[in-house]
């Protein structure tokens, strides 16, 4: 079901046009289709119990998921009405406060993966009173994060068990509920203090903590280590591998701002004819890459200290690649980064691509609301922590033209959270 909103954008079943009955019918139909699909593919049915497997990431499943989620959200809002539907939104800080406590005091690790733990024992282990321990757990249990199988005893659910088992995801959650949650409370103060400036020194993070984010991590290595693990959550490369014809590249891929080189290593293992140079400004990150076991790709990957704010020294490349870097910087800095590639592209064969692998924001209303929301959450996160932003394809195009009028976007191979923008320099 796809209807038009009053402003003409695609909005799915809308509150002004969709009836409760039609939404409910669509939900029933899509839920049945989803269940049938899971069964046909040999997947277990969804469950709140620990050990429940994540659903598949196939195109078929995601299409059913998108349609079902859109209808579920709209039905919930229609049933609640405008006033009641706003209450959970404006009260969400209290839910997040409970989650913050659970992360800070290690609830997810201390409650055993099987069986349960009484609240008195947990409170004693973490060194706080049983009353607040229970209240936090009961708040989370309303989101099916933990369950109270009998009074005063708590056990894992499928959701809480994920935080118990997955250290990287737990670090991502802790990072969000510590640095980011705190910094977000300073958004309005930041804007009031600098109504026309937005960069790392004019960011809510800097307003709250008194230093830009990366300086904060230099001063607090224990939080820097957690941040690094949190960022590791986003290391899946299947979409990147499949959305671009890497096998057609002739020559060396220069991975700029590539950190320890984990993406280049993964691509090298998938495309045995490609070689890689990993560039980063951090000797520590480069050292981590060199220390990895590279025996299976020996001689095909090298490491080089280089800042993407300085002119690119490598010529004759097969491609230049920059992943998840532009969203960390304000527009004027991104222009500097894009300018830095020009010498390298000028000294490479005509048609050598610059591949920008970063979020590509959608045109408003062009995606289902829950998908657009997830992307705009990341855009707000970049504002909060770095005074930076995520960008649309048109915004990338404008910055590219400002950097060099010869830049041209040839194709956006993928959009959303793992966009890939192919850029050429017309020479």
Curated annotation (Swiss-Prot):
For this protein, the record's SUPFAM superfamilies field holds: S-adenosyl-L-methionine-dependent methyltransferases, Winged helix' DNA-binding domain
According to its UniProt record, the EC number is 2.1.1.-
Q: Which InterPro entries match?
A: COMT-like (IPR016461), O_MeTrfase_dom (IPR001077), Plant_O-MeTrfase_dimerisation (IPR012967), SAM-dependent_MTases_sf (IPR029063), WH-like_DNA-bd_sf (IPR036388), WH_DNA-bd_sf (IPR036390)
Taxonomy-wise, where does this protein's organism fall, top ranks first?
A: Eukaryota, Fungi, Dikarya, Ascomycota, Pezizomycotina
Q: Name one GO biological process term.
A: secondary metabolite biosynthetic process
- Show the GO MF annotations: O-methyltransferase activity; protein dimerization activity
Name the chain's protein: O-methyltransferase sol2
Tell me the gene name: sol2
Q: Which residues form the active site?
A: 327
The source organism is: Alternaria solani
């Amino acid at each position: 079901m796809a209807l038009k909103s009053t402003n003409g954008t695609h909005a799915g079943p809308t509150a002004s046009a969709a009836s409760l009955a039609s939404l409910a019918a669509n939900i029933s139909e899509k839920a049945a289709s989803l269940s049938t699909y899971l069964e046909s593919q040999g997947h277990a049915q969804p469950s709140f119990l620990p050990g429940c497997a994540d659903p598949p990431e196939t195109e078929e499943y995601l299409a059913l998921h998108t349609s079902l989620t859109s209808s579920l959200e709209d039905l919930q809002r229609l049933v609640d009405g405008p006033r009641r539907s706003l209450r959970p939104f404006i009260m969400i800080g209290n839910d997040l406060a409970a989650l913050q406590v659970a992360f800070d005091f290690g609830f997810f690790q201390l409650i055993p993966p099987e069986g349960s733990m009484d609240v008195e024992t947990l409170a004693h282990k973490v060194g706080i009173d049983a009353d607040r321990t229970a209240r936090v757990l009961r708040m989370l249990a309303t989101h099916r994060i933990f369950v109270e199988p009998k009074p005063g005893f708590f056990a894992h659910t499928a959701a809480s068990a994920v935080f118990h088992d997955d250290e990287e995801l737990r670090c991502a959650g802790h990072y969000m509920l510590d640095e980011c949650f705190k910094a977000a409370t300073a958004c309005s103060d930041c804007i009031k203090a600098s109504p026309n400036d937005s960069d790392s020194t004019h960011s809510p993070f800097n307003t709250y903590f008194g230093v830009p984010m990366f300086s904060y991590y230099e001063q607090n290595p224990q939080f820097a280590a957690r941040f690094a693990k949190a960022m590791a959550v986003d290391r899946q490369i299947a979409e990147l591998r499949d959305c671009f014809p890497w096998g057609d590249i002739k020559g060396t891929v220069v991975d700029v701002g590539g950190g320890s080189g984990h993406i280049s290593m993964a691509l090298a293992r998938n495309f045995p004819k490609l070689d890689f140079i990993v560039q980063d400004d951090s000797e520590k990150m480069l050292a981590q890459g060199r220390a990895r076991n590279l025996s299976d790709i020996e001689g095909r990957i090298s490491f080089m200290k280089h800042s993407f704010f300085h002119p690119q020294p490598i010529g004759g490349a097969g491609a230049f690649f920059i992943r998840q870097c532009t969203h960390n910087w304000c527009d004027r800095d991104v222009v500097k980064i894009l300018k830095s590639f020009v010498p390298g592209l000028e000294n490479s064969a005509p048609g050598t691509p610059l591949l920008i692998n970063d979020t590509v924001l959608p045109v408003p209303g062009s995606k289902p609301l829950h998908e657009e929301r997830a992307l705009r959450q990341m855009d707000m996160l970049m504002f909060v922590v770095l005074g930076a932003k995520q960008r649309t394809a048109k915004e990338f195009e404008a910055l590219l033209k400002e950097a060099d009028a010869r830049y041209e976007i040839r194709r956006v191979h993928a959009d959303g959270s793992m966009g890939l923008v192919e850029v050429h320099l017309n020479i």
